[in-house]
Amino acid sequence: MKNILRILISCAVLISGLFPQVLAQTVVDSELTLNEISHIQLGDETFDLNATLLLEWKTEASQDSDSESKVVERLTGKELVETLNNLWYPQVAIGNRASKRESEDYILIIRDDGTHQLIERFNVTISLHPEIATYPFGNLDLFVSLHAAHKEIDQLILNPTKFELRDGSASEIIRGNWSFSGERTIGNLFYSLTNDDTELFSMNEFHFIMHHDFSDGFFKIILPVFLIILLSLLLNNFSSLAFAANADWRIGGQLTLLLTVLALKFSLESELPQTHYLNFSDAMFIVVLVVTIFNLVVGILINNLYQKQGDVIARPIEKILETVVPLFAVALISLAFYLTFI
């Protein structure tokens, strides 16, 4: 039933475009300019956005003209508020916002051909979907979902015409360890306030692809994890428990490394994506935890063997583990790469 309803509405939209006299429908062109993208928090699943939205429409009394239209009025402040109270204008909402949209500035431009341009600069915190399986590497799809707020789709259509970065410079508007990778716009979407799709509103999505910087992920996650694994293996292989004095160094060192892993994971909590699947950062933390815990337990057991059974039994087992444990660590790291990148 829902699919049939969507098909009928799509047909209505097409008919209204071919025969505007059939349906009293207003087409509103939408342009979005990104001014600043900041505080991309994968753990909280939000990011902050400062953007400029331009909505353009024509009144029923307007007529097409080949000549360039001239600005009749340019309204701001109190005069703009009074005009909007007595004038119909398209009201839009951001469907994936996580906080209230705060407007910095409003401008209404009216031209002599009946064209109206409403420009709004605003700040908003937007929800994101942290779908980035290869984190701390890879791309993240951020988007702004813009939909009509009061007029249903048979009365108002949002038509995305332009999507750009301010001044065309990604380095100037992106804050944090991310870079701009591309953008796309999706129109002809429907937004429903109810589950039965009885009320449908026109919706556009403005997507911008962000790439996580390699150096940030390498120095914050990959390098510390590999160093902890390496130190854990070195403690095992070069602190033989055949010498009683090494017991404190080896067991205490493994315990310190284990606590370091937990502290690192906790400190990066807001930056790590919370996904329903195993991403690369999760896999690497699991690997380093398994290796350090395994080496800690092995150290305790081998030390106990030396104390109770002596060198005859403990030393051969320790020598075998000096070879097996590094191979085990390499196998776990390879598995982590395979599960996330292949």
Model region roles, listed by residue range:
Residues 204-328:
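Channel- or pocket-lining gating/hinge segments that regulate access to a cavity or pore
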Residues 17, 235-240, 336-340:
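Hydrophobic alpha-helical transmembrane segments
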Residues 24-74, 270-273, 277-342:
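Intrinsically disordered, low-complexity peripheral segments of secretory-pathway and membrane proteins
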